[in-house]
Amino acid sequence: MIKLMAILFLVFFGITASAQVPRVELRAVWVATVSNIDFPSSPTISSDVQKAEFIKLLNMHQQNGMNAVVVQIRPATDAFYPSPLEPWSQWLTGIQGQPPVPYYDPLQFMITETHKRKMEFHAWMNPYRAVFNINNSSITPTHITKIHPEWFLSYGDKKYFDPGSKEVQKFVTAVVKDVVSRYDVDAIHFDDYFYPYRIAGKEFPDDASFRKYGGGMNKEDWRRSNTDSVIVMLSRVIKQENKNCQFGISPFGVWRNADKDVNGSNTKAGQTNYDDLYADILLWLKKGWIDYVAPQLYWEMGHDKADFNTLIEWWSKNTFGKNCYIGLGIYRAGSNAAWKDKTQLPRQIEKLRNTPNISGMIFFSSKTFEKNPNGWNDSLRLNYFKEPAALPVMR
């Protein structure tokens, strides 16, 4: 009798758990190419080895239940595809401007292999980062920083496009237009890097641009208006080229702290989208300029300054009818005490699935899954992602 009851208990709760799995859900992973974080493993491997690595990566994520990959194709004003505007990436071939050997189009290859597995391919591009490290980056003479040095500003050890320059806004838009017009990408995806994160004691050196284009605004509002302008331009050109291509943004997890704005979250983040990165994500959602938002909530539940639960609930109330996916910091499993807790990721998945207006998740990043941290690959494959999910439709 006890054995029978135990069997019935397992059957009942097994069915209940299965029934709770969403039938529509983004299950994606970021694949970072900058500094060869995730792919390729080295900039010196051959094209054939690159292809084999990407296929292995895709197969792993498909087995784990993912239905999309977000692949970085433009890490620093360079390209993982033949571009008429920017050189081949140093993280692809070891030397910026040098094509892969034997020659192939990595972006087309990755899209084809991804779609073959019925997964979405989101093309991840960094809008303003031009030189990753001014001390040791490989820069070809045909790089745009050499052709138009007046468009760029150095800050810390990096070089950035000047977001206030109208020419820069047009150029960034042209780069995105080129990709959407030639490739069957399911989305253009930008991350949190708009204006750079502040460096203590250093001001971003855009005074000359502000004097030229400021138009009577204060500098903070002017900077936000620059970011707004390029988002509007990108939104329009993406839909003109392919009305089915999504435009998604994955911002830093805090829009504003509540002590700065009553509409902000109950957090104490040292920097925020609105006040420091000059990215007014809520405006873009309200205006319908972007199709989805994927805030990077890499903190754990109970974090004293940016609690996961507090933030996911805040974002769920501020989607403005657009799809909202949660960026999960699985990479922290090896270095953060809270993330060494085997229940941290399962609890976060359960929380997001039980929070209104949240339509899925994106994991940062791909390489972490190679180690099966805390056995979470198995948890996804055998439990949380056991049943396939349809991809959310664009709203």
Please annotate each region the language model reported.
Residues A52-A79, R182-A187, L283, K287-W289, ...:
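Catalytic domains of carbohydrate-active enzymes, especially glycoside hydrolases
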Residues I37-D48, W88-Y104, S154-T173, G215-T227, ...:
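The substrate-binding groove and active-site-proximal loops of carbohydrate-active enzymes
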Residues V21-A28, M66-T77, P106-L153, H189-D192, ...:
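Glycine-rich, aromatic-flanked loop segments that form ligand/cofactor-binding clefts
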Residues N64-V101:
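Aromatic-lined carbohydrate-binding/catalytic grooves of carbohydrate-active enzymes
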Residues V24, A32, N36-A52, T112, ...:
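Active-site-adjacent "subsite" loops/lids of carbohydrate-active enzymes
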Residues V31-T33, I37, C245-A269, L311-Q348:
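Active-site clefts of carbohydrate-active enzymes
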